[in-house]
Amino acid sequence: MDDEETSEINSVQGQDEDVQLEVQPQAQGPQDRQVDAIEQAWNNATQDEQSPPAEEAFQDPLAIDGEGGNAPEAMVEDVLQDDTASEGSHPSSDMSLETPGSEDDSDLELLPRWMIPQNRLRSAVDMMVSQARNRDGGIAALLNRDNFLQRVRSIVFSQERRRSRTSEETSQEAADAEQPNDPPPQQPPRPPIDIGFDTNLPAEHSYFGNHLSRVPGVDYLEVGSVHHMLIFLHQHILFPGEVLPFMIDGRMFDEDMPGLDGLIFGVGFPLMQPPEDNPLKLYGVTCQIYERGESGRGLVFYKSRALQRIVINCEDIQGSPQYIARNPTSKCFSKVKILPEYFLPEPLQSVEMGSMARFRDIPSMRDKYRRFQLSTTTWPSDACQEYSFASIVERARQRLESQKIDTMPKCPIQLSFWLVRNLHLTEKMMRLTFLTDSVNTRLQLIKSTFKDESLFFCRYCNSSLAHCADLFAMSKHGVQTQYCNPDGYIHETNTVYRVMSHAIGYSGEPSTKFSWFPGYQWHIILCKFCAQHVGWEFKAVQPNLTPRVFFGLAGSSVRIGKASENTPFNGSTYVVRNMLRLISNEME
């Protein structure tokens, strides 16, 4: 808070001292008196303007349209200018992506009316006041916290600058106000991608160093068997076949590692909602360590691979399970049950054709043989084609052709899990595919998403960031891979070769240290709308690497949704809602 506001508050405290003494001590303490003084200062600063009635001031701030809000336009200007930059402010904090001198008060005249409605802004301020009453420090602490109103103002200006980039956006603003749910614009054509990079390097997680030693042994446990093992938690959903790198205190494992065989442990997923009929179930996977090495900081690097799906009865857990990415300090054990994987062959393969079966594998005779088989059954050809494993594989191959992936597994069980990771399903669909024991059902669920056009949305403000069609593989494991940062946090990273125009900002300075992609520097990127971390930009520092620039979106910060879902493309109608969400987050 600057000196002018402080002196004004002190003067108000002196003028209203008699009024404050009339309040009962039981109902108002020193903190509440300070809150009332700041509220009075706020009212004095705007007393020359016509304020809306009390019932209008507390209208639902999440509504987009509504009556009321008759305060003049000067009210908007007063509130925005109330928290301008001062000696104690931080205009270039993590919520502001522009330079300190980029805000010009003349921009206030250019603010579109839908951007920050008068009555909604007043309601937002009233909500800040009402929610801050019971917080430590009250409103004074809120106003002192990194100059919050200035940061909200910066976000509003950032939105306006993005809107005014092209000549078409002036006319588009009126259309957005009247029809906020217009379909998103068409995806721009995808140029050909030339990858001049060894995709084996990210898969080997070479940023851990070259001193890792191989731990032999890959053990698959019997389906339906129950085992007692060490368990951890993980913030993402892993599917069998994925690699999980992590850093942890070596004492957590070394005592339990049997000889030279890799240790098998369990990883549970709290995000995997259990069935309603049995809420005490925790689903996860078994992981086996296959490489280890010293980090030099008291921690040990481990590489593990997810092997089989498991289910854990929460009543059998001994101890408090901890997240594997948060440097667990205590061991937790539990009984785990290995879940089955059922696969039924294609319907026509179960039809016995006697001596004619020898024509099945001859390419030139395959179609004729299939037609002859269909003529001997009561099944229509469409039904057989619908459940054909080869048909699903071919359609998946065509969909992934542009992603430069040539490591598609042939085993149906492994393929079903591999497709989930590389086709980018919604969270609901990922849970369904994980919970099913039938490989055929899993493939049918995956097939149902082939026609969907999906986008990456910011998980915090629903702004669209990138098209899922722009995914490509910078690792031999596919477009989605788990990586570990120097602090041990595990990021699920999705590689795309471009993001939407004006969708991101940058934080900090680029660096090549601990780069997941050797030869590339990384730079933290933020959502341009809410300034939350959403991933990294990777830029080549060696002249022979291609692509020169690509992006990695953090799975914990983005979500996948259909392009047709009822979400504004640039978050235009969510401006006030997300301002309030930011206010709420700042007070927590």
UniProtKB/Swiss-Prot annotation:
Organism: Drosophila yakuba (Fruit fly)
Pathway participation: Protein modification; protein ubiquitination
GO BP annotation list: positive regulation of neuromuscular synaptic transmission; positive regulation of Wnt signaling pathway; protein ubiquitination
Residue ranges, compositional bias (Basic and acidic residues): 159-168
InterPro entries reported in the protein's UniProt record: CULT (IPR034750), Lon_prtase_N (IPR003111), Yippee/Mis18/Cereblon (IPR004910)
Taxonomy, superkingdom: Eukaryota
Protein name, UniProt field: Protein cereblon
Localization, UniProt: Nucleus
Compositionally biased region (Acidic residues): 75-85
